[in-house]
Swiss-Prot record:
The lineage of its organism: Eukaryota, Metazoa, Ecdysozoa, Nematoda, Chromadorea. This is Uncharacterized protein ZK688.4.
């Protein structure tokens, strides 16, 4: 009886480690995709937005906030 309880406990702990490592690995892959591909997307998006805003401000280079 004790062997069955011990086996069940060890089995559930190993399932927990497998499940948690799968979640962590999936999160790491998603973050890596955003890190490698999202940076260029956001850089291009904000470059277009800030270049449009700077043209509308009549050459005022001291204004750093977006209204």
């Amino acid at each position: 009886m004790h062997t069955l309880i011990l086996f069940r406990t060890v089995h559930s702990v190993s399932n927990f480690y497998i499940f948690s490592s799968t979640i962590l690995l999936t999160s790491a892959v998603i973050l890596a995709i955003f890190f490698f591909f999202g940076d260029g997307f956001f850089r291009e998006k904000y470059r277009r937005e800030f270049s449009t805003n700077s043209k509308e401000k009549d050459g005022n280079k001291n204004l750093t906030t977006v209204e």
